[in-house]
Amino acid sequence: MIKSELIDQLAEANPHLYHRDVERVVNTILDGITDALARGERVELRGFGAFSVRHRPARVGRNPRTGESVAVKEKHVPFFKTGKELRERVDASRESNPEIA
């Protein structure tokens, strides 16, 4: 599912809301999460999961085409850890519907 499909699904489930309002809400939530991560904060959505920022130290990588060593700078990357309820729900859906796997 992509963002536009999520917005469409939410708009269908809430016919009393305009599509543009649903889109604005989704964008506001995602922007809030993004802004918090940019500030180095952790965002926790109980039962769903937690977004955080992890530090990746500088390292020596390899150019896959030439095999040449390449210096990779340190960086901070977003990280998501699933919540217990989400993990259990996904696992249960896989068990009840094996063709998804």
UniProtKB/Swiss-Prot annotation:
Pfam families: Bac_DNA_binding. This is Integration host factor subunit beta. This protein is one of the two subunits of integration host factor, a specific DNA-binding protein that functions in genetic recombination as well as in transcriptional and translational control. Heterodimer of an alpha and a beta chain. One of its GO terms (molecular function) is structural constituent of chromatin. InterPro entries: Hist_DNA-bd, Histone-like_DNA-bd_CS, IHF-like_DNA-bd_dom_sf, IHF_beta. The keyword Aminoacyl-tRNA synthetase does not apply.
